[in-house]
Amino acid sequence: MNAGRQLFVRSIRDFSTFVHTPDAERIKLVESGLMLDDQLREAYRIRGSFTDSRYHTWVCFEFIDKTGVSRYVRFRLINADRGPDRGLPRPEFKANGHPSMDAEADDDRAPDFLRKDFIHRVRHSDVRYILQAQLRDTPPPPVGNHELFDPSQPWNEYWFPWVDMFEIRLNEVIDDQAAVSRLEMNPNRSPECIRIPLATSPDDYASLGHARAIVYPGARAARAAVPPPQNN
């Protein structure tokens, strides 16, 4: 899951173009409409804590209920107090194609202050989230590149309201970095009732989720095959 309700590109081809474009030249992608600066801006956070943000899947998944009815689902994680998304930049802020920026000159916080703050909160406070889902019917007839797959656009919350799934309470931090490094995020490991919509083109809206399912396991295996650095 990621901060911001939506991604700043529409397809895996657009994302690949973004990745392979030097940072100084990405403003041209914004000007051409390939990168969406309003969506990118929404992923920025200025102050606060990891616990202040809402986290979204961006892509949707196919969900088949116990009666065999197929729908589509998106997920998000919100703070248990159900407060708004906090720490957003001022309305006049522009990302200009930059997915991240250096700290401001007057920001004297440590580079890892968010991580340390989160660890402290988990150990000494009450850190709770609520997992929510949006459900959307399959369009009749099914359309291969339907706008519901577009990762750059949120679903209308009036027509597709968020529904509580369960509460998550965090009470322990894993300090074993070796154990953490062995963890893997594999989109293919999901219940049988949740599936990844497939794309037929790198320009399809569903291509981002499809590509993740292919790339992530291979990237994880490649990282695992590299010897860990030695401390002198």
UniProtKB/Swiss-Prot annotation:
Residues 86-107 are annotated as: Disordered. Keywords: Plasmid. GO terms for molecular function: heme binding. Residues 86-95 have a biased composition (Basic and acidic residues). InterPro entries: Catalase_sf. It comes from the Bacteria. This is Uncharacterized protein y4iK.
